[in-house]
A protein has these predicted regions:
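Enriched for short, Lys/Arg-rich terminal
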Residues: 2-4, 9, 13, 17, ...
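A short, well-structured alpha-helix characteristic of acyl/acetyltransferase catalytic modules
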Residues: 25-29
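A short, surface-exposed loop/turn module that caps and links secondary-structure elements
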Residues: 32-57
C-alpha cells in the first residue's frame, strides 16, 4: 500500500500557478515516490529541521519540492515547491 500525497494550502496555491507540463512532471514524480517512499535518488533530507519533524526535498528538473513524511498515517505532505534559484528550504 502506497502513501497518499497531500498539499498544504500554500503549496497548493503555488502548484496551481505552475505551467501544466511542470505540474504533470511534479505529479508523476510524487506518485512514483509515494509507491516506494524511502528509495529515491533525487530525495535528500533538509538540514536544520527538528529531529521530530524532518523534512525532505525532491529535485525535479529545475524545480524543488519540500515535504514531510507522516509514517503513522501514510501521508506525504508537500510543504513548498518552486524553482531552484528562488527556493527556500
Amino acid at each position: 500500500m502506497g502513501y497518499r500525497v497531500q498539499f498544504t494550502h500554500r503549496a497548493e496555491k503555488t502548484f496551481v500557478t505552475l505551467p501544466q507540463h511542470i505540474r504533470i512532471r511534479i505529479e508523476k514524480a510524487l506518485n512514483n515516490f509515494s509507491q516506494v517512499p524511502f528509495y529515491h535518488q533525487d530525495v535528500k533530507k533538509v538540514r536544520g529541521c527538528p529531529p521530530d519533524k524532518p523534512r525532505y526535498r525532491m529535485r525535479i528538473g529545475e524545480y524543488r519540492v519540500t515535504f514531510r513524511i507522516i509514517q503513522n498515517r501514510l501521508i506525504i505532505c508537500v510543504v513548498a515547491l518552486g524553482k531552484k534559484e528562488n527556493f527556500e528550504y
